[in-house]
Structures are given as C-alpha cells and as structure tokens.
Amino acid sequence: MIKQTCIRQFADHQQIKKCKERIKTANKSFAQLSNILALAGNEVRLTILYLLEEEKELCPCDLADILGMSIPAISQHLRKLKDGNVVETRKEGQTIYYSLTQDNLKILRPFFKHINQQTQKLETA
C-alpha cells in the first residue's frame, strides 16, 4: 500500500474548517445538481431538456416526431426525468405536456445558452 504524504509545510486550519463548513452547508445543492447532471448525462435526455427549455412544453408525441424515436422510448426518458423531479407535467384532455421545473430551468439555462452560442458560431462559419 502506498503511503500518501502531503508536501505542504503548514496547513491553514481556518481555510480547511471554512471549506468543510461550506461543503456541509451546500450538501443539498450538490445532491440536487448531481442528480440533474446524471439525468442530463444521457444525450437523448439532454436533447429533451434542451427542447423543453426552447419550446417551454412538449408532449411525448411531439418529442417522438422531433427526435425520430418511438413514443415508448421517449416516455421512458420522460419518466426518468419526472422521477428525478427535473420535469413536471400538465394534462390537457388526454394529452400530457412536459416542461422543466423552474428550479431546474435556472440551473440548466446557462448550459443551453452555451449550446445556442456554439450553434450560432457553426451556422455563421
């Protein structure tokens, strides 16, 4: 077993204590962001989230048509996103519409802004 050593001469105990407290305070936020990023780590789900941000809400049939996938496949992805509290639903007659929750929209919007900026660069190149 390799012994791990640190080459620093002096530990800043105040800094270490402050960082530990900050992590403890932010633990719930870390868990929430980790959950969102884990779900968005799948390319199809990330695309669904992007489309929901752009269009505000879509039904599984619309997403299936846009992505060229079956409705059951889309529904499976939407179920995972809903179970993770990343999306919410609204029912109108027989149709269920999906949208991003407001908290998650705030978290994901900067990522989608980056995607839009990269897309614009490619279109103008």
What annotation goes with each model-predicted range?
Residues M1-A40, V86:
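N-terminal leader segment of winged-helix/HTH proteins
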Residues E21, E54, Y97-A125:
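Conserved segment of winged-helix/HTH DNA-binding domains
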Residues N27-S70, I96-D103:
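N-terminal helix-turn-helix DNA-binding core of bacterial DNA-binding proteins
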Residues G41, I74, L81:
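Divalent metal-coordination and catalytic microenvironments
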Residues Y50, Q76-H77:
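Base-recognition residues in the alpha-helical recognition helix of bacterial helix-turn-helix
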Residues D65, Q76, K82-D83:
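Alpha-helical residues within the helix-turn-helix
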